[in-house]
Amino acid sequence: MSKVGINGFGRIGRLVLRRLLEVKSNIDVVAINDLTSPKILAYLLKHDSNYGPFPWSVDFTEDSLIVDGKSIAVYAEKEAKNIPWKAKGAEIIVECTGFYTSAEKSQAHLDAGAKKVLISAPAGEMKTIVYKVNDDTLDGNDTIVSVASCTTNCLAPMAKALHDSFGIEVGTMTTIHAYTGTQSLVDGPRGKDLRASRAAAENIIPHTTGAAKAIGLVIPELSGKLKGHAQRVPVKTGSVTELVSILGKKVTAEEVNNALKQATTNNESFGYTDEEIVSSDIIGSHFGSVFDATQTEITAVGDLQLVKTVAWYDNEYGFVTQLIRTLEKFAKL
């Protein structure tokens, strides 16, 4: 059984623990580092506005959480290098703060006694894994790995299936993304991004995304071929990605749907639907990406075709299911 520490017990960190318990994983969470008190961490773990009550017992002491009868140490170190991971035997750290998003920064966890780090965010030019797309590139020499973003985990399976079947020449993607904790609840200053200062629950807010760029780290042959941006919208979770691409051959919508359906066969990470679902239907999905065959469109001008494909994703829970799959494989190497 591999022992794991979680750095950052926010939306993703708490769902990591929840999902590990749900799948009865051999991963054992032995320590959590977060600047919030154990009392508040226990409360937020127990009560989740998106996914409902935590199904296991939760209690706390001044320096631990007691989850399903098991004690998990809680630290409150500002600097990763000072976290006593070694004291609890934490071998792999799931980095969920959003601050240690590079190999150089995450090295601090290794210096503190851990053996490996899995970063739950894009982390620059380093090994980046989307499970069932390029997880076969993981090997025993890897010590710090990124699982990219929720949007990359949605886009990558769809882009790979299209590219494998027809070849992608160039494309642009838009994610219609649920608001997140990095946005403002009401209008107010929020760094240098003017639009980020506007109320998340009241506006459609144009936003940046690194998902298209990160595709090149996951599928090297698509490096530089995709561009993308995001529109943040007033939903709590449940997002959708639209990819418009020029392919290497002429296709019909039926051919595209058949190819994508084939790619989802026996694939725990990439799902398929031909039902007319909406964003709330994807909440709690165990897939990182769900292709929507009802939204495939082909627009032709002369010999040029624009091919629109769409995939849904739960940007919190679906992403975490992907993270856990990668974590379990990472732990075995």
From Swiss-Prot:
**What functional role does this protein have?**
Catalyzes the oxidative phosphorylation of glyceraldehyde 3-phosphate (G3P) to 1,3-bisphosphoglycerate (BPG) using the cofactor NAD. The first reaction step involves the formation of a hemiacetal intermediate between G3P and a cysteine residue, and this hemiacetal intermediate is then oxidized to a thioester, with concomitant reduction of NAD to NADH. The reduced NADH is then exchanged with the second NAD, and the thioester is attacked by a nucleophilic inorganic phosphate to produce BPG.
User: A Gene Ontology biological process annotation?
Assistant: glucose metabolic process
Question: Would you tell me the protein name for this molecule?
Answer: Glyceraldehyde-3-phosphate dehydrogenase C
Known SUPFAM superfamilies for this protein?
Glyceraldehyde-3-phosphate dehydrogenase-like, C-terminal domain, NAD(P)-binding Rossmann-fold domains
- What interactions and quaternary structure are annotated? Homotetramer.
Query: Where found, per UniProt?
Result: Cytoplasm
- So where does D-glyceraldehyde 3-phosphate get bound? 149-151, 180, 209-210, 232
The EC code for this enzyme is 1.2.1.12
Is Oxidoreductase given among the entry's keywords?
yes
Any one annotated GO CC term = cytoplasm
Which CDD domains does the UniProt record give? GAPDH_I_C, GAPDH_I_N
List the source organism: Escherichia coli O157:H7
- Matching Pfam families: Gp_dh_C, Gp_dh_N
The organism that produces this protein has a lineage beginning with:
Bacteria, Pseudomonadati, Pseudomonadota, Gammaproteobacteria, Enterobacterales
Q: Where is the active site?
A: 150 (nucleophile)
Database matches in InterPro entries: GlycerAld/Erythrose_P_DH, GlycerAld_3-P_DH_AS, GlycerAld_3-P_DH_cat, GlycerAld_3-P_DH_NAD(P)-bd, Glyceraldehyde-3-P_DH_1, NAD(P)-bd_dom_sf
- In which family does this protein belong, per the annotation? Belongs to the glyceraldehyde-3-phosphate dehydrogenase family.
